[in-house]
Amino acid sequence: MNKYLEYPEVESKETPPQKLVVLLHGIGSDGHDLIGLVPYIKNDLQNCHFISPHGIEDYDMMPYGRQWFSLRDRSPHIIATLIANNISKLEDIIREKQTELNLTNKDTVIIGFSQGTMIGLYLTLVQQAPFFCTIGFAGALIPPMKINNKLTPICLIHGALDQVIDVSEMYNASNYLSKLNIEHSVHKLTSLAHSIDGRGLEIAINFINTCHNMV
């Protein structure tokens, strides 16, 4: 039983599932937000079980919503410390579902949006065993103190008109990943602000299927 909050999930069309897809929402939202993407992608990912956990903390700047970590202080070193302190709680949620489905990291896809991308990328880089792949929409990279995993392929997708997290953050992340020789791709989407659109979902689906073909 999840000791944090019961979250929405969608079972795979095929049984048993071969992949676990973990959807990580942005700040001030909750798991019900990104689970709404599943109807648009599940037909192309029929062997995937989808979960969309709620952020592990109450959103501390509004009386509703959830967060993975506070953004009251946006200093990079403060954010890195907060993520490091909270990351094990997210890992617990994922491990619990992996155990239930008899899956492991190599069968797990991480998809984040905004703050969910921040914690998703951090989570990916600190794993002892690599995830299948990681996809980040409209986010930024907060590097951990220690990199344990350089093997998970990463796809970054960002709107060119994003005024919440500037698209330059995608290129900052790309430069960092390149220095570590981590396989990744970047996609700047024209006429898109801080959001996910059909183009981004198509890129994500193709990326997951490409990674599958490489295994």
Swiss-Prot record:
It is an enzyme of class 3 (hydrolase). Its EC number is 3.1.-.-. InterPro entries: AB_hydrolase_fold (IPR029058), LYPA1-2/EST-like (IPR050565), PLipase/COase/thioEstase (IPR003140). The active site is at residues 114, 162, 194. SUPFAM superfamilies: alpha/beta-Hydrolases. The keyword GTP-binding does not apply. It holds the Pfam family Abhydrolase_2. It comes from the Bacteria. Keywords: Hydrolase. One of its GO terms (molecular function) is hydrolase activity. Transmembrane segments: none annotated. PANTHER family: LYSOPHOSPHOLIPASE-LIKE PROTEIN 1, LYSOPHOSPHOLIPASE-RELATED. Belongs to the AB hydrolase superfamily. AB hydrolase 2 family. This is Uncharacterized hydrolase RT0729. It comes from Rickettsia typhi (strain ATCC VR-144 / Wilmington).
